[in-house]
Amino acid sequence: MRGGTLAACAAALVAVAGCAGGPRGAQLASHDFGDSPAFDPAVLAIAVREVEVSAPSWLDSAALQYRLAYDSPTRRYGYRDSRWAAPPGELVAQLLRKAVIAPAPGAGGCRLRVALEEFEQRFDAPQASRAVLALHAELVAPRGGARIAARRFELERAAASADARGGAQALAQAAAALAG
């Protein structure tokens, strides 16, 4: 009888646990930059053979981040049901590689080093947001590692909607503008 009671109790717990979960939540949305514009690396004045992108620890996750500049300007948030397909640094690196690395014979070419500084959707009001993409880029000589040029970029694009989808699209547009 004792074994039967345990089995009945276990079955009841499983049934209750199944009901306790309630309806399934929203499905997790995974964003990337979509179809890249066509790039022609051959038009570049300097051949690039390698792209290195680094990012600070807070951008080293797939979280789609936003900031409520009008309310909590020092606080970062992440959308619960939306993520990037990869950390922003990886997405930016992939896009830049398509844009600047030309298939060329030989091992020549400079290195492009990029330090991603900011990659977020920023809300200036509850229904108004924009994408903010900031980075420092450095072109390094193929031999010896001497810096040829360096520049800081900050791009902003208005989001079409004040939600994760609008932020992801605006950030993708900012990244495409950087690469183009």
Task: List each model region and its residues.
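Sec-dependent bacterial lipoprotein signal peptides
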Residues: M1-C19
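A structural "domain/chain start" motif
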Residues: C19-A85
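Short secondary-structure boundary motifs at beta->alpha junctions and helix caps
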Residues: P73-S82, G144-G180
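Extracytoplasmic
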Residues: V43-E50, A63, L91, A107-V114, ...
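Surface-exposed short loop/turn segments
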Residues: A20-A38, K98-A146, S161
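Generic short beta-strand segments
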Residues: V53, A115-E120, E154-E156
